[in-house]
Design a protein with these regions (language model features):
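Conserved Class I SAM-dependent methyltransferase catalytic core
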Residues: 140-197, 211
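Class I S-adenosyl-L-methionine
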Residues: 1-80, 86-87, 92, 97, ...
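Short amphipathic alpha-helix with an adjacent loop that forms part of the alpha/beta core around
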Residues: 95-108
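Flexible, glycine-/basic-rich loop-and-beta segments that form/coincide
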Residues: 204-264
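Internal, well-ordered alpha/beta segment that forms a basic, Gly-enriched binding/recognition surface
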Residues: 111-126, 145, 151-152, 160-161
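Mobile active-site "lid"/loop adjacent to the S-adenosyl-L-methionine
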Residues: 119-141
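C-terminal target-recognition/interaction regions appended to catalytic cores
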Residues: 267-392
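Short catalytic/ligand-binding loop motif for oxyanion handling, primarily in non-cytosolic enzymes
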Residues: 57, 119-123, 168-173, 220-221
Length: 392
């Protein structure tokens, strides 16, 4: 069995444990990040609380005082043969969290490293089976990774250098869930890479972060994250969240609430979405009212026409980098060029081709469009592609 990939786990077990074992390039990156903290520091302990097969400790850190913990008995059995068994803990790292549990003195300078599990226990399991995150009450979250971040604060780690989804930071709702962690730690370095570096992840790639945090009583705000300069792995490019305008607050993403209009006056709905990844994965317009359907009206049709255009034509080489963001947009230009997106959608969307001609005429009239059937769709498409390219 390779020390950086647990071949004893089948796909279902990997999903349940949230475990994807780590390529050496990422392990080396973590080691480089923590090196300055290992110099001139006495009484330092390095801890991987979701250690798997020990990849993060074995390469270069075995000479330091360390601890490795994992809940998988087979991984623990393997690690115990490779390391000092007295420093290996086959336990759930999220239960009864305390330094004493891992024989870590209060006075020790604690550096936590690793690739903790991350998955949404409400949605990641197959066949309708729901996951259970067994942890201390103050660590509870539907995502295992968020619970691990909270556990680092409970252990009062001095340094945290781990891999985790970028979405934990760049989605404000997720950031707020970090609670005690964000209030006591500050991001110092962050390098983004694609999930495709991990063996066995799904078809939809998403951004993951090599993150270095220092314990800091001032913590960090979402505005700090919005303006943080993230690097991209093996690239000179940077990612700065505040440089991107999104549809948040401009286009509704979710089905109607109790007091909202429930039925579309033009018989059109748009499938709900969370971010770019879900927008591209899901269908677009639908003709029948549905629990996942957003009500489309004449007045907001152009916004969903823009979404359809974006879904279809936004395909940059590094699309994985933007997948967890809400759809990108230049609101001022979309308001100016409504007709462009409406016309493209009328001509290209298969559902719009099935709808009653009377509805198409209503839409065209509302937006003052001449629906010339001879007009070349490719020229409209190319114009939209140019505009979408300028968003990144």
């Amino acid at each position: 069995m390779l020390i950086d990939y647990a071949e004893h786990l089948n796909k279902a077990e990997i999903i349940k444990l949230g475990s994807y074992y780590t390529p050496q390039i990422l392990v080396d990156k973590v080691h480089n990040y923590i090196q300055p903290y290992l110099k001139n520091k006495k009484n330092t302990i390095i801890f991987d609380s979701a250690g798997g097969c020990g990849a993060f400790i074995t390469r270069g850190l075995k000479d330091y005082d360390y601890r490795i913990a994992d809940k998988d008995p087979q991984a623990c059995s393997f690690v115990s043969k490779q390391f000092n068994a007295e420093k290996v803990y086959c336990v759930n790292s999220l239960e009864n969290v305390d330094r004493k549990k891992f024989s870590i003195p209060k006075s020790s300078f604690l550096i936590i490293i690793g690739n903790p599990p991350y998955n949404d226990t409400t949605s990641e399991f197959k066949s309708g089976e729901k996951g259970v995150n067994i942890c201390d009450d103050d660590l509870k979250d539907r995502d295992l990774g968020v619970s691990f971040l909270k556990s680092y604060n409970k252990l009062k780690a001095d340094i945290v250098c781990i891999l985790h989804p970028l979405s934990y930071l760049i989605k404000e709702a997720n950031f707020k869930r970090l609670k005690g962690f964000k209030d006591n730690y500050k991001l110092i370095k962050g390098e983004i890479f694609s999930s495709e570096l991990f063996k066995g992840t799904g078809k939809i790639k998403f951004p993951i972060l090599v993150a270095l945090y220092e314990r800091n009583s001032d913590g960090m705000t979402f505005d700090y994250i919005r303006n943080f300069r993230f690097n991209l792995l093996n690239s000179n490019k940077e990612f700065i969240l505040s440089h991107y305008e999104t549809t948040d607050g401009y286009i509704n993403k979710y089905p109607p609430r109790k007091n909202d209009i429930q039925k579309s006056p033009i018989g059109l709905y748009y499938w709900t979405f969370r971010d770019i990844n879900s927008l591209k994965k899901n269908t677009s317009f639908i003709l029948n009212k549905h629990v996942n359907g957003i009500v489309v009206t004449l007045e907001n049709f152009y916004k969903y026409a823009y979404l359809y255009s974006f879904k279809t034509l936004f395909n940059p080489d590094e699309i994985w980098l933007y997948g967890n963001l809400s759809p990108l947009i230049d609101i001022r230009k979309v308001e100016r060029d409504k007709k462009l997106y409406v016309l493209y959608t009328i001509k290209n969307n298969p559902v719009l081709k099935e709808i009653k001609p009377m509805i198409i005429r209503k839409i065209a009239k509302f937006y003052n469009i001449e629906n010339n059937k001879r007009e070349d769709v490719s020229s409209i498409e190319n114009e939209i592609k140019k505009r979408l390219k300028k968003l990144i």
